[in-house]
Amino acid sequence: VEKKEPLQGNEENISIRYTVNQATLYNNPTEASVRKEEIMPIIEYPKSGVLVSVDEAMNSPMLILDVMVTNVNSEDCNISIFQLVEKGKDNEVIWIGSPCYYSEGKDVESPEYYHFPLLPAQSVNMKIGWYINPDDCDLGKIYLTDNLNGGEEYTSYVNLKL
């Protein structure tokens, strides 16, 4: 498996460093060993302008990323920084969605679901999942990004090469 890391930027602006060890598109969450109660109850899928229920997601493809995360100097570690995007014409960034599954998450109903304790200089390996509709996007142009709403100079893109 090719390991993919984000481009390195200005070191003082890096709070979390991560490596995508593996990206796998499964036919459904069950194939990925993800149970229904581990998936967010309502999944926003802005690419096609729909909200996806857990029941729908259980019968839909799921992208699972195996990611190693290292806390460089962040006070609050939160997987919501990770977003899927598709790069369209002229490298236009089209948001696909937020994670709907997180291996370290405890309670999908909790507002703290996406948070994880990780002290500076510590690392954790985790699995992060997204509902994805392969008919609605070009799999070869899907990227993992961080800091999507921040400045472009602080945003990294990792081509998942699906």
Which residue ranges define each predicted feature?
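Conserved functional micro-motifs across diverse proteins
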Residues: 1-162
